[in-house]
């Protein structure tokens, strides 16, 4: 009996210590970051510990079991809400409670779920300066055209870039939700490659909803320094995340690189199986890495690559950010918006005076921050 008891104690001691985590998701009406009794709890919000995914109860509460490789508690930010870059909490020792206050944010998503978002990639600001012009272009376009969110698909770049970029573009100073992916040059020296990224930008995989679409952020498989996460980690979480969406929900995946050149998008792992993303109504795989502007239909899925908006592409494409116009079914059209052009106008083809006395003049006009609808013109009569 004593031997049995001793063996049980040894087995328990050898097992990893994991704790249950609890919390609440609520509407932070006064934006103080604290749940007040008068504030509305939110039910049905997905919450994860990086492996397990649960949904909040009617009172906004949740309980997660935790797991051996846990680092964050994070939510799937629901459509119509935003956080100030706080869709996650780092798991701290001796802390088991984690609340999430959400702020209503519905004006930029139409009633039928259609919306637009901005995609940027490969800004690589570690060795460049004077970023204000292109950042302002993105901010002003997002405001003028009511973009639902901005996504950066990685290569921010190296320690200097990682520390600086969050100050350039975040949900608060862009007045628009800003999300980040990790790229190969964002895996830097540390205990593990993503340590610095996590300390600034949070988890390397997570999801959020906008309109009728479920958006999933996934990490670059590898890079300059070995990551602490594995394809097994991502695959296990991804299966659980997808298990909580309504069948037929349109899905878009963001990553720094393209998953496959084939028509079937299968996320593979070593020990956790695989996922055929085509079976989950995958609409697009959106990425960067190649420094080109390129879109291709692979079977039923579009792969969409966007180049650098501050430097241009290695294919000599000009500087631009991409705008995705998404309809109620998750289908989309794509548009490139060229940066550094502030209300540019150029006479293209002045012609001779018509019999009626009218002088037709064709002009080329462009603005980085909005489409041009009209150009007021005044004429001065010049005598010969």
Question: Language model features by range: what are they?
Answer:
Residues 49, 70-92:
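A short, solvent-exposed loop/turn motif at the edges and junctions
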Residues 78-83, 90, 162-247, 270-284, ...:
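Extended active-site neighborhood of metal-dependent phosphoesterases/phosphodiesterases
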Residues 22, 29, 90-164:
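N-terminal active-site segment of His-dependent metallophosphoesterases
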Residues 35, 51-61:
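Short, acidic Ser/Thr/Gly-rich low-complexity loop/linker segments typical of extracellular
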Residues 301-375:
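Binuclear metal-dependent phosphoesterase catalytic core
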Residues 32:
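Acidic carboxylate motifs that coordinate Ca2+ or other divalent cations, activating on Asp/Glu
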Residues 380-384:
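Conserved small/polar residues in nucleotide/adenosyl-binding loops
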Residues 63-71:
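Short Pro-Gly-centered beta-turn/loop motif in secreted/extracellular proteins
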